[in-house]
């Protein structure tokens, strides 16, 4: 709709060299081409988390449940660049359970409380829960049924306190990078 048009126009106005969120179409295109750019903070945080915990990505089957422009789509590119075999599931995907059961890494980012159940996950999988859902009782839960799924995983992120802090950390990292680049450019201009 019209709101999407305005959103696209607004994103184009952000200088891609200062786009710390990684949403400008230039950065989105550069990410798709495997070029150096700012990456959307949540996918960037997920990759950093996997790397920090030395969770193998290369050659692994990774499934992303969700195809948003903020998480799902950029994460596809990030995982592909690390040589994962990437499958994307969404609201029209048939037999999601069959796909998730065969996945080494599962990223749940669809906005449905406790969607991913224990019977949908193979033993030893890594599960990243991006969801933030407020229940009627006020409790915040993710897209993963943590109680069930955590019994089968080798690694799982909690909600709250898992991906959210990593997103903020990557935003701060991008801000420092822009600031440093800006300062370096001005230092060289003076001489």
What are these regions (language model features)?
Residues 22-25, 40, 88-89, 156-159:
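General beta-strand structural signal in soluble alpha/beta enzymes
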Residues 40-115:
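Glycine-rich phosphate/diphosphate-binding loop of Rossmann-like nucleotide-binding domains
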Residues 1-6, 185-188:
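Short, small-residue-biased leader/transition segments that mark boundaries at the very start
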Residues 191:
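Cationic, low-complexity basic patches in intrinsically disordered or flexible, solvent-exposed regions
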Residues 9, 13, 45-52, 74, ...:
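Alpha-helical scaffold segments in soluble metabolic enzymes
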Residues 90-177:
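Rossmann-like adenosine-cofactor binding region
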Residues 4-57:
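Anion-binding alpha/beta catalytic cores of soluble intermediary-metabolism enzymes, centered on
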Residues 181:
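Conserved adenylation A10 loop of the ANL superfamily
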């Amino acid at each position: 709709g019209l709101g999407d048009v305005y959103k696209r126009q607004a994103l184009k106005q952000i200088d891609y060299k200062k786009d710390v969120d990684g949403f400008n179409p230039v950065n989105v295109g550069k990410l798709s081409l495997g070029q150096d750019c700012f990456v959307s903070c949540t996918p960037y945080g997920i990759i950093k988390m996997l790397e920090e915990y030395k969770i193998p990505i290369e050659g692994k089957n990774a499934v992303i449940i969700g195809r948003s422009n903020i998480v799902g789509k950029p994460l596809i590119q990030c995982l592909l660049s690390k040589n994962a075999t990437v499958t994307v599931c969404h609201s029209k995907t048939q037999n999601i359970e069959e796909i998730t059961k065969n996945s080494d890494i599962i990223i749940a980012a669809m906005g449905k409380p406790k969607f991913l159940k224990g019977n949908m996950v193979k033993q030893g999988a890594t599960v990243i829960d991006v969801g933030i859902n407020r229940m009627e009782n006020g409790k915040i839960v993710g897209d993963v049924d943590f109680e069930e799924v955590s019994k089968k995983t080798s690694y799982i992120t909690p909600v709250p306190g898992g991906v959210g802090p990593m997103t903020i950390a990557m935003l701060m990292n991008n801000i420092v990078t822009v600031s440093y680049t800006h300062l370096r450019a001005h230092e060289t201009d003076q001489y």
